[in-house]
From Swiss-Prot:
Name of the protein this chain belongs to: D-aminoacyl-tRNA deacylase
Family, as annotated: Belongs to the DTD family.
EC number assigned by the record: 3.1.1.96
Catalysis: reaction(s): glycyl-tRNA(Ala) + H2O = tRNA(Ala) + glycine + H(+); a D-aminoacyl-tRNA + H2O = a tRNA + a D-alpha-amino acid + H(+)
NCBIfam families: D-aminoacyl-tRNA deacylase
C-alpha cells in the first residue's frame, strides 16, 4: 500500500464539474493498493498518517500532528501510484490491486482515518477527478508498506 501525503493549505476534488470534497488546512492523500494489501497495511498507514508530525509548532519546527492543528484530510484513490515504468514509454499498472478489492480497502482506510475523529473528505473510487490544492511548504512524503 502506498500513500503520497501532501501538506496543504486547502484542497478540493471535482467530479463532472461538481465539488465532491474540499478541505482547508490539512493533508491531501493519494492512496494506492497492490495485490496483497489488506487490514494490516490499512491499520499501519492510517496510524502513520494520523501521527505524522509535519505541521509547524510555535518555534516553526515540524512537530505537530494533523489532530493537533485541527486539520482535515482529502483522500483520493490513485492506482497509478503502482505504475511500472522500466520498459517502454507507456506505464503498466499490473501491480495495482484488483479494483473490486481496492475499492473496499480504500473505504476501510478512510473509515479507519475517520475513527480518529478527523474530518475525511473523498473523491469517488475509479472516477475521473480534477484535484486542486495549495501545497504548504511544500511538504510531500511517500509512505509505502513495502518499506516499513
Amino acid at each position: 500500500m502506498r500513500v503520497l501525503l501532501q501538506r496543504v493549505k486547502q484542497a478540493s476534488v471535482e467530479i463532472d464539474g461538481n465539488v465532491n470534497g474540499e478541505i482547508g488546512q490539512g493533508l491531501l492523500l493519494l492512496v494506492g493498493f497492490t495485490e496483497n494489501d489488506g487490514d494490516k497495511e490499512i491499520e499501519y498507514l492510517a496510524r502513520k498518517v494520523l501521527n505524522a508530525r509535519i505541521f509547524s509548532d510555535a518555534d516553526d519546527k515540524m512537530n505537530l500532528s494533523l489532530q493537533q492543528v485541527s486539520g482535515s484530510i482529502l483522500s483520493i484513490s490513485q492506482f497509478t501510484l503502482y505504475a511500472q515504468t522500466r520498459k517502454g514509454n507507456r506505464p503498466s499498472f499490473t501491480r495495482a490491486q484488483n479494483p473490486d478489492i481496492a475499492s473496499k480497502n480504500y473505504d476501510k482506510f478512510n473509515e479507519k482515518l475517520r475513527e480518529s475523529g478527523v474530518q475525511v473528505e473523498t473523491g469517488i473510487f475509479g472516477a475521473d477527478m480534477q484535484v486542486s490544492l495549495v501545497n504548504d511548504g511544500p511538504v510531500t512524503i511517500m509512505y509505502d508498506t513495502d518499506e516499513e
